Amino acid sequence: MKKIFLSFLLFCTLSTSYAKIDIERIDPPFWWTGMQDRELQIMLYGKNIADCKIKIDYPGVTLTKAVSLDSKNYLFLYLSIAPETQPGNFDIQLSRKREKQNIPYALNARTIQGKNRKG
């Protein structure tokens, strides 16, 4: 009986350590180039993602920090968007042990500057 319990415990431990990275929500879902404030905060929500390593490879976009909370289900990314950054799509690459997941993210072109808006 003891062997069965220990085997079950080992299986549970291994299955959670190799759990698939699954992002359920990302806010904001996209952003714009040409904004006055160059820092962008992105919130990721998914089961046990706080220990993921993050990589972003897009010209003009730099990951300045990734912050996890007490809840292992949230991860906040702080990006710096350079003034010359071109609109386009890139992947937010998450990795943990042997698992990898790419989350597509869009930087759209800003059509009207905020100071020129009427209303």
Where are these regions (language model features)?
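Sec-dependent N-terminal signal peptides
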Residues: 4-14
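Beta-strand/beta-sandwich contexts
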Residues: 19-51, 99-118
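Long, low-complexity, intrinsically disordered N-terminal extensions of eukaryotic proteins, enriched
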Residues: 14-18, 86
